[in-house]
Regions:
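Active-site-proximal helix/loop segments of hydrolytic enzymes
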Residues: 1-99
Length: 99
């Protein structure tokens, strides 16, 4: 069934200034139990109308029973929070080192 076949984690950016942020988050999200489908450009409204670095994270699919089993747990939610925090720290560290 195509409606339930999408699985895993994806990261998207639109403007080039969001690529480094997206890649830093991509690296930290690799530790999560769901497969990381990678990062790509996408022309989503939430991305294309911003001027600051921006990324869209898809952290699992609620219509996929396997993904949903993870998404609904406090353990997975904490893993997501920790991974996103680590990715942001990495991004800002890289940004500060370039200055």
């Amino acid at each position: 069934n195509n409606a339930t076949s999408a699985t895993g984690i994806s990261q998207y950016y639109y403007h080039n200034n969001g690529k480094q942020l997206t890649e830093a988050l991509h690296q930290s999200l690799n530790q999560l139990p769901l497969p990381n489908r990678g990062s790509d450009t996408a022309k989503y409204v939430v991305l294309d109308q911003v001027t600051r670095p921006a990324t869209l994270l898809e952290l699992g699919y609620i219509n996929n029973p396997s993904d949903f089993k993870h998404i609904r747990t406090a353990v997975y939610q904490k893993e997501i929070a920790n991974a996103v925090t680590a990715g942001l720290q990495s991004y800002f560290k890289q940004t500060m080192e370039r200055k």
